[in-house]
Amino acid sequence: MRLVNSLGRRKILLILAVIVAFSTVLLFAKLWGRKTSSTLDEVGSKTHGDLTAENKNGGYLPEEEIPDQPPATGAFNYGEALQKAIFFYECQRSGKLDPSTLRLNWRGDSGLDDGKDAGIDLTGGWYDAGDHVKFNLPMSYSAAMLGWAVYEYEDAFKQSGQYNHILNNIKWACDYFIKCHPEKDVYYYQVGDGHADHAWWGPAEVMPMERPSYKVDRSSPGSTVVAETSAALAIASIIFKKVDGEYSKECLKHAKELFEFADTTKSDDGYTAANGFYNSWSGFYDELSWAAVWLYLATNDSSYLDKAESYSDKWGYEPQTNIPKYKWAQCWDDVTYGTYLLLARIKNDNGKYKEAIERHLDWWTTGYNGERITYTPKGLAWLDQWGSLRYATTTAFLACVYSDWENGDKEKAKTYLEFARSQADYALGSTGRSFVVGFGENPPKRPHHRTAHGSWADSQMEPPEHRHVLYGALVGGPDSTDNYTDDISNYTCNEVACDYNAGFVGLLAKMYKLYGGSPDPKFNGIEEVPEDEIFVEAGVNASGNNFIEIKAIVNNKSGWPARVCENLSFRYFINIEEIVNAGKSASDLQVSSSYNQGAKLSDVKHYKDNIYYVEVDLSGTKIYPGGQSAYKKEVQFRISAPEGTVFNPENDYSYQGLSAGTVVKSEYIPVYDAGVLVFGREPGSASKSTSKDNGLSKATPTVKTESQPTAKHTQNPASDFKTPANQNSVKKDQGIKGEVVLQYANGNAGATSNSINPRFKIINNGTKAINLSDVKIRYYYTKEGGASQNFWCDWSSAGNSNVTGNFFNLSSPKEGADTCLEVGFGSGAGTLDPGGSVEVQIRFSKEDWSNYNQSNDYSFNPSASDYTDWNRVTLYISNKLVYGKEP
């Protein structure tokens, strides 16, 4: 019996050993085989809980409960950071938003006419950054990077309760890409004109400008953007295979067709609308290889792998060497570095791809051949002033992926992983401030983001503080000396973008996997509405014995969400007791208007007893938070009694609190939307209604204006500009000096930079209005090289489209200056009234994006982080120098 038991136990142990060994092999195959040549077929056959292709809500996944979390061991709550970084993409959504699943109340439907100009539905997708253009190159890159994060760290997303959220955000973008691909060789790569879009500052829900659609096809191709979209959809086909097999197949179908389109055309000749915003500087071969690698992983078709490798000699080399490039970063323009890493793992040897990715990561960490990326004093690996954190955190994500690779160098893997942690921690606040909105200590509160700011006045200055919290947004980041300004106008340091968060999400997933941290189970972006959104301001224009004249201004400052109102009305209540006592009636009262912005006025109507009202109906007049003339409408109306009759306003309900010479918000003048009370209180009501919690429809009517200006930028070499004939004969009129002041702020304080970003404020302290078309500003600098230069106006209170920029060479170079940028204004800029000011935020760069040395520039002031008087920039009015000193 003992022998049998002993033999039985041995058999059992042997069987268990075999099972364990076999399970280990399967696990290894799953984890690492998928990272070499697996197509995830064996994984794709499984389901995730009860999620299937039959899930409701258009294929979007339901919100999941956050599982119990293990104890956190890291310096930060990486789970919360991951949760919020994913949420940021919900804030960027364009199109029709489902209120049943929306996790924030300050976003609504927007861009619902996108594609109508082309007869196609192009709604959906993400707005690019703090603007509202849908640029498909950075958008598809962002979707691809988010998908890669899920591919690598799916378990982290599940454990943190963020799996469905990230899949839904990726699907939101991919659904849009599929819409953009209506035919095999046709792809719509952009919606919205960048110049017109940047000329307006307001919420997405009430955009007034036309939004043209741009496409590439076989006659005018765009291989870069098409291949990047192919990559995004190929990755989506892999990660959605578990939860929605049909959708996975649809993504793969489009990915294959788009790749063939990009690969057989090999040209970006048709990709023109994004020039000046998202040029494809690295060419298209990196995107072709990147897409081919992902298609190989999605299909196991080795022809894609062969194709990816065949372009490796076209990815680029370091200047004057035969060394594959390594001194940049994975980004929307250049996906070479991610391709290095994927091919290194697939080949799984010590070949050229492994050498290439290690060379790249070495340069970012310990250095390569005695050279290393710049590090700030506080530890940020700093590549460039535009999105410095974006580059560091994305490279850190690649470092994490390398560290997981079984065949990677173990010592390097440790170094890379420590680098990744340090960069994640820098972004989250290791220096004493967080660079993620709504997270950690001293986070950014004023990101360069139109909808989060919530202006109703087409102005970065109104309101002075942001109305909404853009949770999870990673801002651009500091300069090379750790300097950072939380300023809405500083788009260099403080803009946010879809591609900024893309690699950051993957990095946070790895940090969460290593160190834990608890996402907030109650987190959302639902905000209290702290102010009246729709209301009337009123005052007394004039009065006499038998009349009262009221000036009333209807305001729409809606922001939860912003919305267009076309059916507003208000009522002015009066008590006609004195009229009745004089033997007259309501029919004897006359209502007239001397000034009216689109309203219809009723006769006096009965309310109850001796209380009557005049209804001012603005139906058909669009009032929306889109600018000074858009968000408010004024009506001046008079109520007159017959001659010899006294009209006493003191007993009128709506007269309460009104006075002459000023207007005040009045709850006694109730406002209605389509007949529903949305602000104020009627006579006899116990409490007032406010637009904070009204039942206004969240549907946003389309705003159209009669015409929209298109902002322009000069894109010419300095030598193409003739030195102005008046350059050496400028009249020195010091008599007006002091009446007009030019202030300067530096939007980019780096000594070495590939763009110069001055900001100007002109202040009129005089007594006369200034015609802005007579005004010129000059900024003096050294050009360093012969490349032509580009000029952009990023924002101006005079309207971007009304700002011009011209470069010219000084006839006699001076110390610190051989070139001058002259900024002017078009006739549409209007006048600058006494006591007023106008702001201009511009930037310029060389066509080849080579660096300037700002440190020796005459007009450069590195300490001017905010507006300050600076006499090394000059101001001219009608060719008279009125401020500053020429070099």
From Swiss-Prot:
<feature type="signal peptide">
    <location>
        <begin position="1"/>
        <end position="55"/>
    </location>
</feature>
<feature type="active site">
    <location>
        <position position="448"/>
    </location>
</feature>
<dbReference type="InterPro" id="IPR036966">
    <property type="entry name" value="CBM3_sf"/>
</dbReference>
<feature type="region of interest" description="Catalytic">
    <location>
        <begin position="56"/>
        <end position="518"/>
    </location>
</feature>
<comment type="similarity">
    <text>Belongs to the glycosyl hydrolase 9 (cellulase E) family.</text>
</comment>
<dbReference type="GO" id="GO:0030248">
    <property type="term" value="F:cellulose binding"/>
</dbReference>
<dbReference type="InterPro" id="IPR012341">
    <property type="entry name" value="6hp_glycosidase-like_sf"/>
</dbReference>
<dbReference type="GO" id="GO:0008810">
    <property type="term" value="F:cellulase activity"/>
</dbReference>
<keyword id="KW-0119">Carbohydrate metabolism</keyword>
<feature type="compositionally biased region" description="Basic and acidic residues">
    <location>
        <begin position="43"/>
        <end position="53"/>
    </location>
</feature>
<dbReference type="GO" id="GO:0030245">
    <property type="term" value="P:cellulose catabolic process"/>
</dbReference>
<dbReference type="InterPro" id="IPR008965">
    <property type="entry name" value="CBM2/CBM3_carb-bd_dom_sf"/>
</dbReference>
<feature type="active site">
    <location>
        <position position="495"/>
    </location>
</feature>
<keyword id="KW-0326">Glycosidase</keyword>
<comment type="function">
    <text>This enzyme catalyzes the endohydrolysis of 1,4-beta-glucosidic linkages in cellulose, lichenin and cereal beta-D-glucans. Principally active against barley beta-glucan.</text>
</comment>
<dbReference type="Pfam" id="PF00942">
    <property type="entry name" value="CBM_3"/>
</dbReference>
<dbReference type="InterPro" id="IPR018221">
    <property type="entry name" value="Glyco_hydro_9_His_AS"/>
</dbReference>
<dbReference type="InterPro" id="IPR001701">
    <property type="entry name" value="Glyco_hydro_9"/>
</dbReference>
<dbReference type="InterPro" id="IPR008928">
    <property type="entry name" value="6-hairpin_glycosidase_sf"/>
</dbReference>
<feature type="domain" description="CBM3 2">
    <location>
        <begin position="736"/>
        <end position="887"/>
    </location>
</feature>
<keyword id="KW-0378">Hydrolase</keyword>
<dbReference type="GO" id="GO:0042802">
    <property type="term" value="F:identical protein binding"/>
</dbReference>
<keyword id="KW-0136">Cellulose degradation</keyword>
<feature type="domain" description="CBM3 1">
    <location>
        <begin position="529"/>
        <end position="684"/>
    </location>
</feature>
<keyword id="KW-0732">Signal</keyword>
<keyword id="KW-0624">Polysaccharide degradation</keyword>
<feature type="region of interest" description="Disordered">
    <location>
        <begin position="441"/>
        <end position="460"/>
    </location>
</feature>
<dbReference type="InterPro" id="IPR033126">
    <property type="entry name" value="Glyco_hydro_9_Asp/Glu_AS"/>
</dbReference>
<feature type="region of interest" description="Disordered">
    <location>
        <begin position="40"/>
        <end position="66"/>
    </location>
</feature>
<protein>
    <recommendedName>
        <fullName>Endoglucanase 1</fullName>
        <ecNumber>3.2.1.4</ecNumber>
    </recommendedName>
</protein>
<dbReference type="InterPro" id="IPR001956">
    <property type="entry name" value="CBM3"/>
</dbReference>
<dbReference type="Pfam" id="PF00759">
    <property type="entry name" value="Glyco_hydro_9"/>
</dbReference>
<feature type="compositionally biased region" description="Polar residues">
    <location>
        <begin position="686"/>
        <end position="729"/>
    </location>
</feature>
<feature type="active site">
    <location>
        <position position="486"/>
    </location>
</feature>
<feature type="active site" description="Nucleophile">
    <location>
        <position position="131"/>
    </location>
</feature>
<feature type="region of interest" description="Disordered">
    <location>
        <begin position="684"/>
        <end position="730"/>
    </location>
</feature>
<keyword id="KW-0677">Repeat</keyword>
<comment type="pathway">
    <text>Glycan metabolism; cellulose degradation.</text>
</comment>
